[in-house]
């Protein structure tokens, strides 16, 4: 059955092999003339069909590379080399089969992502019954936010959700490229597409199927697979010169020898399979390699653009920095202990939605300080929170808000990039908690790597205040800073940056316009910044800036492989054509040799799958040294 499907998949190969067999039988029974006519009619039909395809390509704006194959088939028929003509047909159709095989191999990782897309979810009938696993199956698209789902061992998590089970272990390799299992605890988010471990778990749906992480990845992969624009453009650049060289060599051989057969013998070695097949295979391999590394490039055009990048611009908050405040110091007032101040503040901040509150709670948990429940709590928007804990009134917030309730409040001296939350207990100032948005530990290494790898200009484009932006930029090695920008100003600056192409990296909704305006927009998509991801050309699925290095390195490796495979094919073809001009390579032998050239270039193009080494070594600064550059701190948004 498989053999029959292959015959139907490649009908031209099947018909050509049958034509070969029939011509061979006719030769055996001394009917060479009939065999000649059958071969001639068959090849002529293929020529007509190929010409129709060429016209369609030209109408779509692409150069018809098959012109050399058509001329070669016509020339071999004209001089009576009908066996060579059949071999050329077999070579072209075989080249398409090789392209199909190599393309399937190259897009294997992309296809794996699509094939693993979750389709069914188990919705629990009675979520309140911890002992009951009775559930009904629904399509993933029908899961509603808040549904409690059962995920059995080794099943794929269908939608993004909050883990309700005490602990679970998940394989997130399809999302992040991390091969080791990852442990998640109750209350933590589990992304769709992760594979559950050896025990059943429960989770509450945070997002619908369409909005979940894996389904967004699938949409991006579909978009990447459907794009072939750069491959065609890359081949078109070589098509006309290669065609001209081949025709000149063939015409010269005919003119010097006076033998029209020599024209056909040269053109047989000029078929353009390295251009038609090797380059597309290399680009597909690059897209697949990137996807496996947690980087989705939306089209092949991006692979070529990112390979040639000469300028890079970065947003600050959430891109160069971690985008979340971390506690850097506790300054207790006289009579208060640092841990006591932090514990009371964190307990009160359980009832606040402010960004600083999360950093304070995280710091308390990291120090092993239990959060206590409040008898009552209220939050004053943009100012702070008040809670009654163990009979004590705890107030946390802005200095003016806390001072209105505790007149002895003392403002803390803040360093560049620091923000403070002030704490009062029972009307007395208890201390200040200093927080900062720390730079990503890999940010300096990424900037250094780009500078060392032919990126001539690195800039920061941010809406943050200049003093903070310049402090971060200085510590990360970025010399050009544009601060206090509105989105339209970011777009204008991205359009003006030279040299080009320009790469822009951002993560937030306000970055979407500038990501769309840049030559290559890269979105840090791990946190679900949908608008930025939609506008970007590249989406990084892992919360790591080091993946920018992966994207550039894979793009350059892929383009290098594509160009090298093209030049290998062209070099071998031109060399063989020069030899054929002397009459040393008959048409039939030339057609067979050219098939080997095609195979060699395709095998070389598959090197794009291996790719360069991924990521920056921990602690690397881009120069091979072990030290990590100093970490900058930037202010978290104030209350």
Predicted segment positions?
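Cytosolic catalytic headpiece
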Residues: 112-113, 300-520, 553-556, 608-609, ...
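Actuator/coupling domain of P-type ATPases
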Residues: 2, 23-24, 34-120, 124, ...
């Amino acid at each position: 059955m498989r053999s029959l499907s292959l015959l139907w998949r490649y009908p031209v190969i099947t018909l050509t092999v049958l034509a070969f067999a029939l011509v061979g039988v006719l030769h055996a029974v001394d009917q060479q003339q009939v065999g000649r006519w059958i071969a001639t009619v068959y090849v002529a039909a293929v020529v007509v069909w190929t010409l129709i395809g060429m016209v369609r390509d030209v109408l779509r704006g692409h150069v018809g590379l098959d012109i050399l194959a058509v001329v070669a088939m016509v020339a071999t028929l004209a001089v009576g080399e009908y066996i060579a003509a059949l071999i050329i047909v077999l070579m072209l159709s075989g080249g398409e089969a090789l392209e199909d095989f190599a393309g399937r191999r190259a897009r294997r990782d992309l296809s794996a992502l699509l094939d693993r897309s979750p389709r069914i979810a188990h919705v629990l009938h009675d979520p309140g019954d911890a002992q009951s696993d009775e559930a009904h199956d629904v399509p993933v698209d029908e899961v509603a936010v808040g549904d409690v789902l059962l995920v059995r061992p080794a099943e794929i998590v269908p939608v993004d959700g909050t883990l309700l089970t005490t602990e679970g272990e998940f394989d997130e390799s399809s999302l992040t490229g991390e091969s080791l299992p990852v442990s998640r605890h109750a209350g933590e988010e589990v992304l769709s597409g992760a594979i559950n471990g050896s025990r059943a778990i429960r989770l509450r749906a945070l997002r619908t199927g369409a909005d979940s992480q894996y389904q967004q990845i699938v949409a991006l992969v579909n978009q990447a697979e459907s794009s072939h624009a750069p491959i065609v453009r890359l081949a078109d650049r070589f098509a006309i010169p290669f065609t001209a060289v081949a025709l000149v060599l063939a015409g010269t051989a005919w003119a010097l020898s006076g033998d029209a057969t020599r024209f056909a013998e040269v053109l047989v070695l000029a078929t353009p399979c390295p251009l038609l097949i090797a380059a597309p295979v290399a680009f597909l391999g690059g897209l697949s390699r990137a996807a496996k590394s947690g980087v989705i490039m939306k089209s092949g055009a991006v692979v070529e653009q990112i390979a040639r990048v000469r300028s890079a611009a970065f947003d600050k908050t959430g891109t160069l920095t971690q985008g979340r405040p971390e506690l850097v110091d506790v300054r207790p007032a006289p009579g208060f202990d640092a841990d006591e101040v932090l514990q009371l503040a964190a307990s009160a901040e359980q009832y606040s939605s402010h960004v600083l509150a999360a950093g304070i709670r995280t710091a308390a948990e990291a120090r092993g300080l239990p959060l206590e429940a409040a008898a009552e709590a209220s939050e004053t928007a943009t100012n702070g929170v008040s809670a009654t804990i163990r009979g004590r009134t705890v107030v946390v917030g802005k200095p003016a808000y806390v001072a209105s309730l505790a007149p002895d409040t003392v403002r803390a001296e803040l360093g560049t990039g620091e923000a403070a939350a002030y704490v009062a207990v029972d009307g007395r100032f208890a201390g200040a908690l200093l927080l900062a948005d720390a730079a990503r530990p890999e940010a300096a290494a990424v900037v250094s790597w780009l500078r060392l790898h032919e990126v001539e200009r690195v800039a920061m484009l941010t809406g943050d205040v200049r003093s903070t932006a310049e402090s971060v930029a200085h510590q990360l090695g970025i010399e050009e800073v544009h601060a206090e920008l509105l989105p339209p100003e970011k777009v204008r600056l991205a359009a003006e940056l030279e040299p080009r192409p320009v790469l822009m990296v951002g993560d937030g909704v306000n970055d979407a316009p500038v990501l769309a305006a840049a030559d290559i927009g890269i979105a840090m998509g791990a946190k679900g910044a949908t608008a930025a991801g939609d506008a970007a050309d590249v989406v990084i699925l892992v919360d790591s800036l080091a993946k920018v290095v992966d994207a550039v390195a894979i793009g350059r490796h892929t383009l290098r492989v594509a160009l090298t495979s093209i030049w290998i094919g062209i070099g071998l073809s031109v060399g063989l054509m020069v030899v054929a001009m002397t009459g040393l390579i008959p048409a039939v032998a030339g057609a067979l040799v050219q098939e080997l050239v095609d195979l060699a270039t395709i095998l070389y193009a598959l090197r794009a799958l291996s790719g360069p080494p991924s990521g920056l070594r921990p602690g690397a600064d881009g120069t091979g040294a072990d030290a990590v550059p100093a970490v900058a701190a930037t202010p978290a948004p104030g209350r």
